[in-house]
Each structure stands twice: as structure tokens, then as C-alpha cells.
């Protein structure tokens, strides 16, 4: 019986403390991506490009490109083009990116083009914040949306004014790296946590020797490494595969006010409370009343007068009891029992936190 209880306690402890690799919890300070941006032209559109009379920068860009290719456009020429669009091109330069390596680019219309489907991005230099060209982008655009229009009716699925080119840019310039310089580097936690930072430092010290790692704060752990690139690569490879017991994270509820989505982690709990939620609906009806003269040849005029009716209804919500819930499943059941919409649920969660019934951090994005 004692052995059974000991095994059960050990099982519960190992289940509560989940082991994770250090590489999944941290990143190396200084090893990061860098944003690139460029301005270019997309050609080959099927009549869905910019209306050049309303987007003069498209025509100006096209004239500059043609002049660089040795083609002179007569002054005052009004080019009515529908298969060209001005776009912004963005990409991320990966850490340790080498010359000749390809990266993905995102192409977004900046004019009034209807769609970029079927278009080809012409050679576009991508620059960093230092105005240096780090990559050149060119290729056929893949647009995930779809749309059609006929007879004054149209239908559209997803976004047509943006697309992606897989491996659409070639790196032409490398960023200087400080990796391998010095005898220390910092590991940055993905989420600030004092206990996790100390656990990682203790784990490294147990394997590599005391003094190998020091927790600087809730985000950074300083690690002593051997000098030289190859030695540091091997050292980091060993450290990143070490296992650390992950402590329960902070209870948090994230609300997206634009989409109405609500996401919560498993640490969220509720205390007993009572909730009443009323719904307010506004209905606007507008009709056109036509008044015509009684005599057809009396010289009167037909008059159209709009008539608008506004109906305001508010349904009173009954007071409902929400029981104390200690697990995520019980929290979900308790909130679903209220029968509230996602928009109402956001207000309810905010009120619960103000009343001290929601045991979690509330974050609105």
C-alpha cells in the first residue's frame, strides 16, 4: 500500500512538473531576424492593376524604370495602364544569413489595384534601417484569395491585394555578427520568470560546473562559454538540449477586441459570483413613401419622402450563479452556462476581474 501511494505521488509530481528543453524556453541574445523593406512594381495583371490617373506614383515609377532600361517616354504622355501596380515588399533577414541564400517575401499593394493575382514582381532591392541593400526580390506572386464580379455583383474570399513569393529574394549582403566574440553570452527567456531563470542557471551549473551560468534577472541568464566560433557552437548545442522542469505559468486570459476571440490557459480559475447580462439591440427601418398627384394632367409633381423608424429593445438578463471552478474545463462549462456571445463574454470577464472573481491576468490586444 505504501509503495502504491509513493508511486502515485511520484506520478502526480512528474505530471505537474513537465520537462522542457532549454532551446524551447530561451533564445540567444543577438541572434535575431532583421526586417527589410522595398518598393517595386508588379506587372502582368489581368486588368486589375492601379488606375494610373489616381495613383501618379505608379506612372512615375514606371517612367523611371523604362528610362533605366533605355526607353524614353515622350513628355506629357498619359499612359492608361491597368496591368501594373505599385507595391511594398517586406522580408525578414534571418540570423547568419549568407550570400546566395533565398528568403520569402510578402508583397502588398499600396495603390488602388483590385487584385495582384497572376502578377510578377519586378526586381526590387530590399533595404534595412541603414539604407543598405541586403537582398533582391523578384518572382511570381501567389495570392491566397479569390474573387469574381459580373453584372454589378461581386464576391470575394480572403484578401486579393497581398501575396507571397516563396524563396523570392536572394541575399546579397551579410550582416556582421558578434557571435564567437568574447567569453560570455546571454540566454533570453521567452517569458520573464525569476524561478525559471534560476532553474536554467542551476541546471547548467550542475552539468557544466559551478559558475558556468548566472541568472541576471527574470529574462536573461549569462553563460560562460569557450572562445571561438566552433567551440561556442558545440557548447550551445549541449546546453540547449538540457531538460528543465517547467513550473506552472501565470494564469492569463487574452481577449482580441477586433475579432471577439477569447483565449485562456489552464491556470485560470474562478471564484463564486453572480452575473447578469442584458442585451441591447437597435433596429432601423427606412421606407420611401411616394406621393403622386390625383389628376394626371393637373401639373403636379411626384414627391418621394423617406420615413425612418428606430426600434430600441433591451432584454433584461437574469442573475445567474457562477460556481467556483478550479480547472480549465470547469471554467469553460461555467462560462458556457451563461449563454453569452463572445462580445458579451469580454465584458463579463472584465467585470469578473474587477470583482476579484477571475483569478487571472486579463490582456486585451
Curated annotation (Swiss-Prot):
It comes from Shigella flexneri serotype 5b (strain 8401). One of its GO terms (molecular function) is structural molecule activity. The gene is flgI. It is found in: Periplasm; Bacterial flagellum basal body. This is Flagellar P-ring protein. Pfam families: FlgI (PF02119). One of its GO terms (biological process) is bacterial-type flagellum-dependent cell motility. Residues 1-19 form the signal peptide. The basal body constitutes a major portion of the flagellar organelle and consists of four rings (L,P,S, and M) mounted on a central rod. One of its GO terms (cellular component) is outer membrane-bounded periplasmic space. Assembles around the rod to form the L-ring and probably protects the motor/basal body from shearing forces during rotation. The keyword Lyase does not apply.
